[in-house]
Amino acid sequence: MRRFKCTIQYDGTDYSGYQVQPNGLTIQEVLEKTLGRMHKHPVKVIGSGRTDARVHAQGQVIHFDTELSIAPASMVKALNTLLPDDIRVRDCKEVASDFEARYDVVGKEYRYFVRRTENAFRRHQSVLIPYSLDVAQIRLGLAHLVGTHDFSSFCVAKTETDNRVRTIYEAELIEQGEELIFRFQGSGFLYNQIRIMVGTLLDVGRGRFAPDDIKRMLEAKDRNVAGVTAPPHGLYLWEVFYPESKKGI
């Protein structure tokens, strides 16, 4: 038995998230059904983490076991032939049998896209902001999020873990034409953390909060003091990081 690690991208518009669930089509379900067709038996797919309904991925990582005598490059071609067009396999590598797509993760990068003008072709991939934003103020607020903090104010109350301390290594706002891209790289993120941080930073940009309010929100450890949760369709799981020893055979 061999273990394959695949990097996949998907448009989450028509899916109820990544993880298999009773109601609604999911990315994991489609992947497992496709691999099942290839193998003629059920194949379990493990992902680096969940993404919610309508959230996209540029670099989700999965692993699965196979007894097929097939090269990784051929696996990419076979899967992309069978998968729907909104799910693509970007890369596939054979890895050691102890590689875990979920538990070996050492960091992740997320990006959130907003646009300042109407664009029919980007309506499901970025969020329209119909009001003016002060980009300089947003960047000042963004700087307060870098570092190790308790992010209780920036996650939903039902977050499963009691430990809400996370480290953000890098955070920046990129201007790209009519779009603004929030980029966050960190050790890991809490449920809805990116969307709440972005929603709050957009409120900074429109003057509802001052940049220094971000620091006070972190200290408060209270979800009620932060801003709204930004919509899901602007969010992308961009890249997942692993130790060098887990990169592949």
From Swiss-Prot:
InterPro entries the record matches: PsdUridine_synth_cat_dom_sf, PsdUridine_synth_TruA, PsdUridine_synth_TruA_a/b_dom, PsdUridine_synth_TruA_C, TruA/RsuA/RluB/E/F_N
A GO molecular-function annotation: tRNA pseudouridine(38-40) synthase activity
Pfam families listed in its UniProt record: PseudoU_synth_1
Record carries keyword Isomerase: yes
Reaction catalysis annotation: uridine(38/39/40) in tRNA = pseudouridine(38/39/40) in tRNA
Enzyme class name: isomerase
Binding site residues for substrate: 110
EC id: 5.4.99.12
GO biological process terms, semicolon-separated: tRNA pseudouridine synthesis
Key word Isomerase present: yes
Catalytic center residues: 52
Coiled coil: none
Keywords: Isomerase, tRNA processing
Functional note: Formation of pseudouridine at positions 38, 39 and 40 in the anticodon stem and loop of transfer RNAs.
Sequence similarity: Belongs to the tRNA pseudouridine synthase TruA family.
Quaternary context: Homodimer.
Protein name in the entry: tRNA pseudouridine synthase A
Organism from which the protein derives: Exiguobacterium sibiricum (strain DSM 17290 / CCUG 55495 / CIP 109462 / JCM 13490 / 255-15)
Gene it is expressed from: truA
